[in-house]
Every structure is written in C-alpha cells, then in structure tokens.
Amino acid sequence: MKILIMRLELRAEWVNSLKEKRMIVLSLTKRLSNKFNVSVSEVNYQDVHEKIGIGIVSVGTTKEVLYSLKEKIIDFVEDNTDAELIKIEEEIIDY
C-alpha cells in the first residue's frame, strides 16, 4: 500500500476577506474530494485571507498511480481556480 501526502500553497491576492476566502476553499476542497476521491482539508493560513494551504491524502496500490493522480490534481487546481499555485509539497510513503 502506498500513501500520497500533498500540501498545496496558493496565493489569492484579490480576496478581500476571510469569508470570501473560505467560500473559495470550500468550493475547491469539495470539488477535489468529489472528482478524485481524496481526503482534502484546509491546513494552513486559516487567518490569512490572501493565502490558501490545502492538504490532500490518497491511498493507492503503486507509486505510478499516485504520481499520475498528483499530476491530475495539480492540473485541476490550476485550471479551476484563479489563485496562483506557489508551492507544492508531496511525499509517497510505503506502508
């Protein structure tokens, strides 16, 4: 069993309030969870309205499957939000 752990950091300079940011984060996390069957949560910057930190976890049978999933998730985030993806951290763990 392999476990993919990702942390994405996004910058959304046009966001003016935490309420507006939370609407964006909620929409993005729900769409990621539904489309890719992954666990998603806002993990950083809850009190900073211009930055978004999202954690994503998935389990797979091979590293290749998880690397493919990672690329699809990154493409989806870049295509479905106006926020700039500024940092990607990822790790695949053998369990």
Name what the model sees in each region.
Residues 38-43, 86-89:
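A short linear hydrophobic-aromatic micro-motif
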Residues 21:
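C-terminal binding/interaction regions
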Residues 61-95:
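C-terminal structural segments of small proteins and small subunits
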Residues 4-13, 18:
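Short glycine-/aliphatic-rich beta-strand segments at the starts of folded cytosolic domains
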Residues 3-4, 41-61, 93-95:
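Short, charge-patterned binding micro-sites
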